[in-house]
Design a protein with these regions (language model features):
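Short, charged, solvent-exposed linker or helix-capping segments at domain edges/interfaces
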Residues: 38, 116-122, 153-155
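Short, charged beta-turn/beta-strand-edge "cap" motif at the junction between a beta-strand
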Residues: 73-79
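Structured loops at beta-to-helix junctions and adjacent beta-edge loops in soluble globular domains
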Residues: 28-30, 110, 144
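Charged phosphate-binding loop/patch that engages nucleotide di/tri-phosphates or the phosphate backbone
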Residues: 146-163
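Short, acidic Gly/Pro/Ser/Thr-rich loop/turn segments
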Residues: 32-34, 114, 151
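Compositionally biased, charged N-terminal/linker segments
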Residues: 1-66, 159-162
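Aromatic- and Lys/Arg-enriched surface recognition patch
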Residues: 82-142
Length: 163
């Protein structure tokens, strides 16, 4: 049986043609493996969000559009939203997956969260009671509603209209 070809190199982030209405997401990362500081160090080029092995998270990434925004969440250590990222390359093969089943998007850092928003604070806010982070906290790439986006930005000291 022939071997599968290697996954293509990660596409470079393209200048985003802003979607008419961007969607919002939350990306979880263990800071010991890949931190917000490392994400920021990638600059405008961004970084492939590789290694996700959950079908719902994969579907979420396949639904993303250029210019969509996301929260960068430190899981396990810190458990807080620390920054804002932008989707800068659409779903493509995950180079860390030899099977070709898994996809990833590329994201680049846009802004620090002036006041990191802890999981405890999110859970304590009644406006966020239905947020996926509260209801299904293990999902590594999850949708965020526009109302949740605005509320978390407010909690973190950001004007959602400026992001």
């Amino acid at each position: 049986m022939p071997r599968k070809p290697k996954a293509a190199a990660t596409p470079a982030c393209k200048p985003a043609a802003p979607a008419s209405t961007p969607a919002f997401w939350l990306f979880k990362s263990e800071p010991d493996s890949f931190s917000w500081e490392q994400q920021k160090a990638r600059g405008k080029k961004g970084e492939a969000w590789e290694g996700v092995r959950n079908f719902l998270a994969r579907s979420n990434m396949k639904a993303m559009r250029l210019g969509d925004r996301g929260f960068f969440y430190h899981s396990n250590v810190g458990k807080e939203i620390v920054g804002i990222v932008e989707v800068c390359a659409l779903a493509h093969p995950d180079a860390s997956d030899a099977t070709g089943v898994w996809k990833c998007v590329d994201v680049r850092a846009l802004a620090d969260m002036p006041k990191p928003v802890s999981l405890v604070a999110v859970k304590a806010n009644r406006k966020l009671a239905n947020m996926v982070l509260v209801r299904s906290s293990r999902l590594s790439v999850q949708p965020v509603t526009p109302a949740e986006w605005a509320e978390v930005c407010r909690m973190g000291g950001l004007d959602p209209a400026s992001i």
